[in-house]
Amino acid sequence: GASGWMWSASRAARVIRFFTFLRHFKGEWAGDPIQLQPFQQFIVGSIFGWIDPATGLRRFRQCYLEQPRGQGKSTVAAGVALWLAFFDKEPGAEVYTAATHRAQAKITWEAARQMVLRSSLKQSISVRVSNLHQMSTASKLEPLGADVNGLDGLRPSGVILDEIHAYRSSGLIDVMSTATGTRRQPLIFEITTAGVGRLGPCWDHHDYTDKVVRGV
């Protein structure tokens, strides 16, 4: 592949197929298995399908996803978070959902929690008040607020950053990105609707992503 990277269709398909073991818990599809739409399969496949052939580790460590409301961002993010926490073969995985407010951070986490409760995953994953935990791997999925104080002890292997258009500074993003340094193949997954104005880290990441897509 380009620059030595390799596309693994099987690695991408494995994570896409994982979603079918999860179930919707809201609206008209509540109770139905999650079938990712083609554009969602592209997102998930792009994250997990590109690897370093020498190490087998993922190529991408950061993903920026900007979509209007109602496009299933939280569903995709919750499934990705569950995979990173409990199926990524990362010893002692720490995956966090974060936002400017804890209530916002809990949206993706609550979606993941409901997915566990409605699937066979609940047989191996403990559903707690404050997190999801798997004793056999010492892994967890947990929501956070945006207070960067006291986060120095975290060693995240995955972070879902929700609605980054509301972030006034890059403080939380920087702290979490730096904290992933000890992990083999960490992922920072930013999800957001479009914001207003060009202040804050969201515009910077939007602009950078646009240039990457256009090959600038």
What are the residue ranges of the model-derived segments?
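Phosphate/NTP-binding elements of NTP-utilizing enzymes
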Residues: 1-216
